[in-house]
Amino acid sequence: MPRALDKTISEILSKYGETPKEACWDCHGVWVVYHKAIERMAARAGITFDQPTVIEASAANKTAVICVTGTMADRSEWSFGEASPANNKNAYPFAMAEKRAKDRVVLKLLGLHGLA
């Protein structure tokens, strides 16, 4: 049984046109926001991203680490995204690293980081 969703999460989702039912799923008792919902909220919030900085890239080893900076109004946040065989089963580690980095930045800018 999932724990109750934090009221702050519901309020922030609503502010950016999302509902918990459509935007979230319960991952073993922890609420997680779907990537597609994060992308929609980022667009609605006017979040923009700088060109990512590649920290490590190896197609042969299927590893990618990037640093992404995003801006919303006058605030900026940055975060890493990483993918390797140890934490990624997909055949596209570079796209997965980008997704993870951008999602983390958006969660920080929207005030959801650490909540969802």
Show where each model-derived region lies.
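Polyanion-binding surfaces on beta-sheet-dominated domains and ring/shell assemblies
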Residues: 1-116
